[in-house]
Amino acid sequence: IEKFAEVYLGKDHSIRELARAVFTSDEFFSQRARFALVKTPVEYVVGSYRMLGAQYNPGEGDRRNRRDQQTYTRSRLMGMDVFNPPDVNGWDLNIGWVNTSGMLERFNFSNAYISNRSADAPGAFVSNDQLRKYTRPASKKTVKKFLSALGPLKVSSATIKQLKGYLETDDQGRTVAWTVSDQTIDQKVRGLVHQIMSLPEYQLN
């Protein structure tokens, strides 16, 4: 704290220089700083859009207003009424975001988001072509590619094995060889994304 205070005082109380010092410091990039806070609902929603390169179909009306409204609505359902904080300090929940109703809404959002397959329906969607960019001929490499795209997330070998097993299991519960096709991308890869977005590790920044 002291070294940042010195920058602030020494640079004529410049917020710009203070921010520069913080964002370029070793502490900012340390392992302790990564995945130390729970994503706020806005971070969860907007981050999910950006990390997978989602597109947006506004339906009827102004594109920007409809997109923003969807973000606000989803965030509010998760417990964060954007631009209407509980007090002047804003939200200081962190682990408080992890509650029964909030987590259920996160799971519901991730399912609805990744299930929206095309521009035919209003809302954010990820096309099969976009998902194909992260899909690999080997199931384990596919899992790791999506863990990287959605984070990068560090998960246990057991979690990787479980996600890999999901890709190699058909709807009847039988073990099958992993192949890359329009069908597997549309079904299994979308399911994989939903499972990753439901992981405890994905809830953290």
Placement of each model-derived feature along the sequence:
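Flexible, low-complexity segments enriched for small/polar residues
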Residues: 1-11, 17-205
